[in-house]
Amino acid sequence: MMANWVGARPLLILSVLLGYCVSIKAQEQENDEYDEEIACTQHGQMYLNRDIWKPSPCQICVCDNGAILCDKIECPEVLNCANPITPTGECCPVCPQTGGGDTSFGRGRKGQKGEPGLVPVVTGIRGRPGPAGPPGSQGPRGDRGPKGRPGPRGPQGIDGEPGVPGQPGAPGPPGHPSHPGPDGMSRPFSAQMAGLDEKSGLGSQVGLMPGSVGPVGPRGPQGLQGQQGGVGPAGPPGEPGEPGPMGPIGSRGPEGPPGKPGEDGEPGRNGNTGEVGFSGSPGARGFPGAPGLPGLKGHRGHKGLEGPKGEIGAPGAKGEAGPTGPMGAMGPLGPRGMPGERGRLGPQGAPGKRGAHGMPGKPGPMGPLGIPGSSGFPGNPGMKGEAGPTGARGPEGPQGQRGETGPPGPAGSQGLPGAVGTDGTPGAKGPTGSAGTSGPPGLAGPPGSPGPQGSTGPQGIRGQSGDPGVPGFKGEAGPKGEPGPHGIQGPIGPPGEEGKRGPRGDPGTVGPPGPMGERGAPGNRGFPGSDGLPGPKGAQGERGPVGSSGPKGGQGDPGRPGEPGLPGARGLTGNPGVQGPEGKLGPLGAPGEDGRPGPPGSIGIRGQPGSMGLPGPKGSSGDLGKPGEAGNAGVPGQRGAPGKDGEVGPSGPVGPPGLAGERGEQGPPGPTGFQGLPGPPGPPGEGGKAGDQGVPGEPGAVGPLGPRGERGNPGERGEPGITGLPGEKGMAGGHGPDGPKGNPGPTGTIGDTGPPGLQGMPGERGIAGTPGPKGDRGGIGEKGAEGTAGNDGARGLPGPLGPPGPAGPTGEKGEPGPRGLVGPPGSRGNPGSRGENGPTGAVGFAGPQGPDGQPGVKGEPGEPGQKGDAGSPGPQGLAGSPGPHGPHGVPGLKGGRGTQGPPGATGFPGSAGRVGPPGPAGAPGPAGPAGEPGKEGPPGLRGDPGSHGRVGDRGPAGPPGSPGDKGDPGEDGQPGPDGPPGPAGTTGQRGIVGMPGQRGERGMPGLPGPAGTPGKVGPTGATGDKGPPGPVGPPGSNGPVGEPGPEGPAGNDGTPGRDGAVGERGDRGDPGPAGLPGSQGAPGTPGPVGAPGDAGQRGEPGSRGPVGPPGRAGKRGLPGPQGPRGDKGDNGDRGDRGQKGHRGFTGLQGLPGPPGPNGEQGSAGIPGPFGPRGPPGPVGPSGKEGNPGPLGPIGPPGVRGSVGEAGPEGPPGEPGPPGPPGPPGHLTAALGDIMGHYDENMPDPLPEFTEDQAAPDDTNKTDPGIHVTLKSLSSQIETMRSPDGSKKHPARTCDDLKLCHPTKQSGEYWIDPNQGSAEDAIKVYCNMETGETCISANPASVPRKTWWASKSPDNKPVWYGLDMNRGSQFTYGDYQSPNTAITQMTFLRLLSKEASQNLTYICRNTVGYMDDQAKNLKKAVVLKGSNDLEIKGEGNIRFRYTVLQDTCSKRNGNVGKTIFEYRTQNVARLPIIDVGPVDIGNADQEFGLDIGPVCFM
């Protein structure tokens, strides 16, 4: 409680003095007609008329028109404490404060009400000594004197504690006016002023000069019960006598009896919110609520184990300045550093001796408007709390009634800087004020002597980077440092570009013979086969060892919302969040109780001031006057004569930079001395001249980390540093956690009607309404379009047949008749033809999710689709054993800049490093505290003003001034050209999950379009009308910093122009050559936005540039975006119970909660029964084109084609020339000899001989040899057309053989799939029932024995052909010519659509498929296809074999077997060429193989 009171008192004084100043101003205006007041001087210090000051702790003085009246402060004799102490600089002892001496102004909790404080009695100011009278004997107590005239109003006092009510006295008669009182302060105020200085010690912290005596204040509160004598009997009302002379102060009377208990006080304020009551019984289940806000951030987890070293991340964003770390141990003395930069201006020295009064200066510019003080209520309000932090700007209140114009207040003294408030909402644009005239520059004061070295203040907040300074002249090279220790091996740099080929090196010497090498790896494989499809998913491996951290992956697609998780345990209470923005106005509260009486009215016109009298005795309280009405504002008086010079004030803010002096010549560098021992610290020297900027030294090697020092003692609190420049606008912070609830705010006024809200969610479809009443009959419509034919009417009676009349002219269509009665509703019409597509409707709100439909009928297998995009990565496979290092690749192109990674977790603290080489000169330290004031010097004579000097060259930028008041906003400038597009921000925080939309109909899958070429940047469109402000989105995080653009060439030096307007801050350029400092050029117009250039190679790191001077304070930025959601306010007072509301609508379906934690992995279930064979899968994509095979042998001549149909008869030819004479004999007889006799039993002549040609002669016999030849030829042709599967006539496939000879039985036959010569035919087994062609392995079995006796890696197959001694991959076909079978199988695959093969694994103590002990398939045998595809027992069904029998699941010493079968339509995967058992390696584990034939169909 005491701390609260102490913290509040300076603020109370401030309000008193401000109110005091306002009164003075009014008084001054009224007093303009009177004489000027005379100031006082004491000890060389000037005080204005009616100033009050304390020259010593126990003395108080007042200036009365040139005369100084002083008096002693009396202290109370009794203090309610054991060991009172007198603070330094105070007069009266006080009780020591209990508790820590923490005077921090942080907001503490409100304490309980304290005991009434002791108010020391201050005797009034001592009057001038009168003539000494003879000492008289003590006379009897005189009658009560007449009531004195009210003294001039003193300043409003600090509210005192409520006094003990005295006994009611009899009303006395009003006395005659007496002499005026001694001073302008009522006794309670002077006591409080004295008590404030004595008790709190904070009066000096307020930093206010005592003001002059204010006008008459309102009547002070009832004082404490005095310790004067006992109450005498009330005398009869006497005639008002003339006022007698002031008698001497009587001796103190005995202590009076305690007064009666006072009347009840006014009701106190509401107490603090009580403790939360116990939970009530659970209420009825409520309707589903709207989706909740994101929960609070969870606790920080325990620190995990140290992970392996990750890859070097992208450079992180610049972090905020960390807190000051603990002071490390004192390091060893470093070598002498380079000369430092020129230091900043030191603090202002102690004030010099008081000079003679100068001539009155010109009137200064108008001071800033002071804070108007508010009038306090009379009465006894409680103690003021500490000042809270400045709140956010509230919403604009309604326009109040126009108040009467008050008297203008005087300029207040500069108040203490308040806490920086949060940015208010932008105010309406004010009118642009006219620029004031700038005052003349003051004379420069003499430089003070350097103050003592202050203790180091806390590290200030890092300021903004300054603009680059003008490059200094190159300094002399410093002495070369000693070589530093070797640094730690740095990380491997990025690969450089490939260098040119170096010259051939000399041959080296022959090395010693190496040790015996291990068994070599298997030889190179043959040419790779065509790429197979991806293998089936491998069995679930056991959890591998922790891998090294991979590089950060790209930003993944947002996941689907998870199911709601269980509510977590209640977290610990978080720290209070940051102060949120002010909440909206609450509803109007109930009217409060009647307020206290208003303040007294304004003072009447003041009479001529009398001379200040001595303090009279305190008169009895007069009756309260009626509150006066507010007087009209007085006319402003004339400006008074300037006062005398005031005392030198405290050090002001740093002034603007002075003009630059001319550069001195550079002295010659002295020789470098040896390093001496460190001497004792000398007295603080005067500030040396600034050394030139040294050349940055080469960075020393990084030393090893030294041991961590012990935590140093906390240093003394340093002086507060100079207020830094406002930093650049920081990134918008993330949402802080919800802070504690604030107290309920005052009830606000009802706001205006808000804008219409967003479109609501579509409601559920209402029930159909009842039909409405029949409407009134409408007016007759316009003529309608021709109607459709009506229904047939009822059949009429047949009329008499009339004669056919002539066709009349078509009559005009008659008017439509009156509307008939409404017919019954017709039956539903046929659907109309499809209308044209309407305009695209606005996107509707997502409806609730419909129920899942029934599964549809299985569709026909679709056509094979185009090759899809790469699928999402599958589950992470087992970590492979590390492969050998590959050769270094060609350096890749520079990748695009990655998104900024999240900050890594804090690592374990490293051990402290050794002391590194001395760093570059640090930034100048904060200014030390001001030194003790020097002695007063003799006042000098005022010199004549000198003539105006010429304007000096522009000096370097001075230190930043304190931020100026916000200027009036200028008129809007022309909009600048569009800037280049900024980098894309990183993905913002994930928003609240939206309501689930209605399930849309499944669209047809579109083909992916080709990527278009990026269009050129279009012309900038015209500025559109300003849209309504959108809702404030969550703040995005900063995008990555763009690459720096190319450097422009340096321009020629121009002639120095006049100083232009300050341009906007440009990018930091490279330091140019050291030119003479030119005056600042005008800013160039921004160039057009160039097309983005290609990313350049990463440049070498530049050397560190010189530290530039601090830049000027930037213009005030635009108001930032709306801040994050503020903390939740405290619960308001509980309202009256409302009436029961209507039943609410059914709530929307709640959002799915976050996914619960993954459960532990269950053990693998027992394998289910094999399902039915699935339909054949789609045909896979064609394999890569194989290498062309060797040229095959020329095939046998083909079968003669059948005779074509006879063509049409041709025209008769020209008659030929006559032939030569023929030989003698019968041609027909010769034919007959050849062909034999023609009879009817013979078969028809060959088709070549038709009936119109000569028939054979039937007279001669046939030669039987020709018949045999023809039959043989016919048989050969027939076997060529339908080969019989013999070695001489091999079939192409068994399926061909079955088609040509359906009656053949299954067995071994010869086939020649590549046709051509039958020499390379192979012997196969043909299954004539299915048409399969089966090729046997050679050898077809592997004997059972222990093939592998060393431990195998966990769950990795050990290949029989690749890894095991005396093992080999399987071959097929003839053992003598295995290549023939390979070639023929290549053609056979082209002729087949399906392949299958069985393999039997004979086991003893080794698992073939199911591990009966672990109940999983992790140790199942792995098969390898001919395209190196691994075929496994689990995973993708396309790469998974089936098991026909398995008796190898137990390791019981028995021999068992597992029969594997694999069928595939990708025939390139078969035959199986290798087997990889997993469960082998022990001496008692044996296996053998029976390799079945591979069958193609």
Curated annotation (Swiss-Prot):
Describe the processing and modification events after translation: Prolines at the third position of the tripeptide repeating unit (G-X-P) are hydroxylated in some or all of the chains. Probably 3-hydroxylated on prolines by LEPREL1. Hydroxylation on proline residues within the sequence motif, GXPG, is most likely to be 4-hydroxy as this fits the requirement for 4-hydroxylation in vertebrates.
Q: Name where it mostly resides.
A: secreted
**Gene3D superfamilies assigned to the protein according to its UniProt record, in alphabetical order:** 2.60.120.1000, 6.20.200.20
Q: Where is the composition biased (Basic and acidic residues)?
A: 708-719, 774-785, 1061-1070, 1125-1139
Q: Which residues form the propeptide?
A: 1228-1497
| Keywords linked to the UniProt accession | Calcium, Collagen, Disulfide bond, Extracellular matrix, Glycoprotein, Hydroxylation, Metal-binding, Repeat, Secreted, Signal
Signal peptide residues on this chain, from the entry's feature table = 1-26
Per UniProt, Ca(2+) binds at: D1312, N1314, Q1315, D1320
Which Gene Ontology CC terms are recorded? Answer: collagen trimer; collagen type V trimer; collagen type XI trimer; collagen-containing extracellular matrix; extracellular space
Q: Does Disulfide bond count among this protein's keywords?
A: yes
Any Pfam family hit: COLFI
Where 4-hydroxyproline occurs along the chain?
P288, P291, P294, P609, P615
- Specify residue ranges for compositional bias: Pro residues: 168-180, 234-246, 917-927, 1169-1179, 1209-1224
Per the UniProt entry, the disulfide pairs are C1294-C1326, C1334-C1495, C1403-C1448
Metal-binding as UniProt keyword: yes
Carbohydrate-modified residues: N1260, N1398
* Cell attachment site (motif): residue ranges: 141-143, 504-506, 942-944, 1065-1067, 1068-1070, 1125-1127, 1134-1136
* Miscellaneous comment: Mice homozygous for the targeted deletion of the N-terminal telopeptide segment of the COL5A2 chain show poor survival rates, possibly because of complications from spinal deformities, and exhibit skin and eye abnormalities caused by disorganized type I collagen fibrils. The alpha 1(V)-alpha 1(V)-alpha 2(V) heterotrimer makes a critical contribution to fibrillogenesis, basement membrane organization, and cell viability, and may play a possible role in the development of a functional skin matrix.
Q: How does it assemble?
A: Trimers of two alpha 1(V) and one alpha 2(V) chains expressed in most tissues and trimers of one alpha 1(V), one alpha 2(V), and one alpha 3(V) chains with a more limited distribution of expression.
Q: What is this protein called?
A: Collagen alpha-2(V) chain
Give the species. Answer: Mus musculus
The UniProt gene name for this protein comes to Col5a2
